[in-house]
Amino acid sequence: MRGLNNIAVALALSAIWSFGLDLGRHGTSGSSLLLALFRTLCKAYPFVVISHFVWSAIIWPTFFSPLRQLPNVPSDGWLSKETLRLVSEPRGVPQSDWINSLSNRPVDLARYRSFLGFERLLIISPKALAEVLTTKSYDFRKPGLIVSELKQATGMGVLLAEGSEHKSQRKALQTAFNYRHIKNLYPVFWDVAGEFATVLEKQIPTGTPRTSDTTAVIDIVDWASRATLDIIGRAGMGQGFDAIQNDDSRLHQAYRMIFEPSRGAIFLALLRLIFPERLVNWLPLRRNKRMRHGIQVIRSKCQELIRERKEKIKRQKAGVDNSGNDILTVALLNGVFTDEQLIDQLMTFLAAGHETTATALTWAIYILCKQPEVQNRLREEIRMHFPNPKGWPRSERPSSNTLQQAIDFKLPYLNVVCLEVMRYFAPIPLTMREATCDTTILHTFVPAGTRIILAPRVTNRDSALWGPDANNFNPDRWLSPKNGNREATEQSKFKIGNQKRDSTAAPEVTQEEVRGRTEARSNYADLTFLHGPRSCIGQSFARVEFAILLATLIANFEFQIEDESLLDERNISISRGATSRIVGGLKVRVRPIAVV
């Protein structure tokens, strides 16, 4: 990349020379000086942008990059129709097809070029992933452009922090996400899920027996977002947001404005490739105005939560236990964060904590509509153990431990369906890192500034890791028959809230029993929550939340896709934002299941 530095120096000298000429023509008064400087910058900036593009997108990857010797995808080369798929198809889909079509498998790394020609290094093998995510995790950071995109909605919390700052923040927050604490949240998850089912049932016309074919059509994308927002509020912040009961909830409407894909969002993203972030955010565009309003609503709510929790802690200090373990209480009692940093942490968990799980729940309902036999089998298992699937009155509700045992150990098919949904429909299909220094990955030299692609959509459907049916939705891949006996298979246990063994909680199950015939031979074969120091801190929370929401919905309702053309996934429009959110919603027909 030294050549790029030389170009920058040459352009700077050219700008200084141009500035001197302007100064000579217009004099040295204050106004003339500013005018000459402005003119010089306006003249130089396009040349800087164009020169940077020519070097980074054409000269460097074509003639100088040390990564040229790696396997290149697609096989047709950069200037081909295949490259157009990077902007016309959902993120990660083209890369997944390219990797699975390679003849010389397995490979550790592959190189491709973006639509504009910029070089990308795709991390493929478990060994390469382990080095990037664990061994050298802090050698790779989120690029500035991605940080500027995300921080508007998430704040500069643990998700975007880097280096020592990230280590400090993660350590301070870890207590709130220990599985020991997550176990105590099962009843909270179940209560919100039961409320969700009750409100959905009210959407169905009354006046006929519930055993009839009375149905209603709902947008599961919107409802899933409302449910997960209420869960993160109650379980993470100690306060519900009334999103399930009230479609006009200010917080829900704010996130709808922020996450709803639009042409304006795409246009602003393109502008950020060329112009400084502050300039783009300052532009008087409708999208910017909506973003500013939404963020203001969210920040105000976070300030309110912090203020109320501080007052509650003060009241409790007089001889009352105040050792709450929700995210906000842990962060406050730790004393590490300022109020502004606390707002950033709450914004991080509100945005990342509800949008990703809502996306997973949406895709789960979709695939169960597409495979009704899986939906029916799952419903049968759930109702066998939960005859009153909308929950219990508080006076009759089982203990946290009883609920945890039931969800984790008595519902094996629920567990594997959830695992397969997270594998097949990774909510975040692709993320990017940038090498902060000259480094190596499996002895391959990687220059500073190289863009690294970590793609759950690619890894989770890699046929070299998951077998020839990697691109099929098959929950049974996680189950392993014993002597061909399917009943024995159903006894396989996999604790969805925690992947660590607890020998006192259930019979020991080997990894082979869990993984099945097409077992994923490495933990790094499943990239949904990443791995290592930068893995998702809230993955246990998300897994349990997702499982309980899905169990409640499937136990209470039968789902069908309203528009049958969408049963072909290629007809579904998917956001090109951070998550694989379905654009325009997903209409499903809901029929209540009678309680027997």
Curated annotation (Swiss-Prot):
Disruption phenotype: Increases the production of fumonisin B1. Causes growth inhibition in both solid and liquid media. Increases the production of ceramide intermediates including 3-ketosphinganine, sphinganine and phytosphingosine in comparison to the control. Pathway: Secondary metabolite biosynthesis. Induction: Induced by fumonisin B1. Residues 484-503 have a biased composition (Basic and acidic residues). Its EC number is 1.-.-.-. InterPro entries: Cyt_P450, Cyt_P450_E_grp-I, Cyt_P450_sf, Cytochrome_P450_monoxygenase. SUPFAM superfamilies: Cytochrome P450 (SSF48264). One of its GO terms (biological process) is fumonisin biosynthetic process. Heme binds at residue 536. Gene3D superfamilies: Cytochrome P450. It comes from the Eukaryota. Cytochrome P450 monooxygenase; part of the gene cluster that mediates the biosynthesis of fumonisins B1 (FB1), B2 (FB2), B3 (FB3), and B4 (FB4), which are carcinogenic mycotoxins. Also plays a role in self-protection from FB1 toxicity, probably through derivatization of FB1, and may contribute to ceramide biosynthesis. This is Cytochrome P450 monooxygenase FUM15. It comes from Gibberella moniliformis (strain M3125 / FGSC 7600) (Maize ear and stalk rot fungus).
